[in-house]
Amino acid sequence: MDAWEVVDRTPDMNVIDSIWAFKLKRFPDGMIKKFKARFCARGEQQLAGVDFFETYAPVVQWTTVRLMLILEILLNHKSKQGDVTAAFLHVELEEDEKVYVKMPLGFRKKGKVLSPKKMLYGSRHSPREFWKYLSNAMVACDMQPSRMDPCLFVGPKVLAIAYVDDILFWAKDEKDINDLAIRLREQGLLLEQEDDAAGFLGVRLSYTSDGKIEMKQTSLIDHVIETLGLDTKMAKSKWTPAEQ
């Protein structure tokens, strides 16, 4: 993706460290989906006003997520899930936000550093710049951000919400979602589509036979219990209002 170039290190450079971040990506039921290794910049070492200026990036509100799931039921819409591959690397780095990064472990060369051409994971302003990129791509495809929630995009036939690189789409006809996905790819977005929305941000979505959508976090609860070393037989449990 032509993300950086190797340059000579000079005394006036503010060079920040880099790390490898290893992560398991899981399905909503907790099963392992893929192993990920990501090269990241140590953003906490960036200098405000020198390496970056603004960092705020909106994310979809959970009230909006719940509202859209309710509309899916009431309007009998189809839903599909999308994920943007290497999201931050879509964004070209502006010259006034130039940052230099140490080469990753295993590839270091004496006197050499990386000069990123694209936004790197870990950079303080990467989320903001990607949100602007995604928003512009949506607008170019006739998807307008809502005034109530800028991460809710409303189009002639499709509705979408975005939480950084995770996107949910809704439409009466699945073909309209597929057509929008094609247009977004034409805008340069590396968008992977999945089947019906099975989960979002760690919450599992289950569709019942009587037309309801259940939201569960069983895998997260099990992970917390395991991490804390709790005995489920000894721990006291409480019913949620929805289960009573």
Task: List where the protein language model places each region.
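Long, low-complexity, charge-biased intrinsically disordered regions
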Residues: 1-244
